[in-house]
Design a protein with these regions (language model features):
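Residues that define the transmembrane beta-barrel architecture of outer-membrane proteins
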Residues: 21-23, 45-51, 90-94, 138-144, ...
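Helix-adjacent hinge/juxtasegments
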Residues: 80-112
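Residues on the lipid-exposed face of transmembrane beta-strands in outer-membrane beta-barrel proteins
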Residues: 27-31, 51-59, 71-73, 96-102, ...
Length: 194
């Protein structure tokens, strides 16, 4: 996992050396509304609100197409109710999406692509009891990201909305399949877009 994250970070930061005139770097942040979906229908599953913050690179491939790799710290989770007990799962990931964008002249961008996520923290809360549950989850999650963004012309500022769908089972020890899915909304700033 550390090797894959290192390769992703090196590739992310080396994009500027390849075609500096077509690459922009930026920062982003915002809110998450996520839940961990599973096939155990006896659990009442409700979403959890979290946040995300990270860096992005915007690489123009052609007049209307761009590639946008990102490295983003993201907090997600789920609330489960089983009988009288309620348990909250809080998970933190480093997400590395690589999005292909179609850019309209008015600043609107449609985007989609694969995402790999690396688990960095996992805790559960049931009443006053807090537990480290990282060993219960797989360290990597593979999924798809799709959404839209809007870059305000001549400012570098933009808005982003995205749906992330986990495709792999993140539950390491359970008898049921669990996948992450959720919405992200946020803002970003590209440094050399003015």
């Amino acid at each position: 996992m550390k090797f894959l994250l290192s390769v992703a970070l090196v590739a992310f930061f080396m994009t500027g050396t390849v075609t500096a005139q077509k690459v922009s770097f930026g920062i982003k942040g915002g809110l998450n509304v996520y839940s961990i979906h599973n096939n155990d229908k006896s659990l009442d599953n409700r979403p959890v609100t979290g946040f995300h913050i990270g860096a992005l690179s915007h690489i123009h491939l052609a007049e209307k197409f761009a590639l946008q790799p990102e490295v983003v710290f993201s907090t997600i989770g789920s609330n489960y109710k089983y009988g009288p007990d309620e348990t909250r799962y809080n998970l933190s990931y480093i997400n590395v999406p690589v999005l292909l964008q179609y850019m309209f002249k008015n600043g609107l961008r449609l985007q989609a692509g694969p995402q790999v996520s690396f688990l960095v923290h996992a805790r559960s809360h049931t009443g006053d009891i807090k537990s480290d549950i990282r060993e219960d989850f797989r360290t990597a999650d593979f999924g798809l990201a799709t959404g839209a963004s809007y870059l305000v012309p001549n400012t570098g500022f933009g808005f982003d909305a995205r749906f992330n769908l986990g495709l792999s089972d993140i539950n390491k020890n359970g008898t049921f399949k669990s996948t992450n899915r959720g919405l992200q909304v946020g803002v970003f700033y590209l440094f050399n877009q003015k």
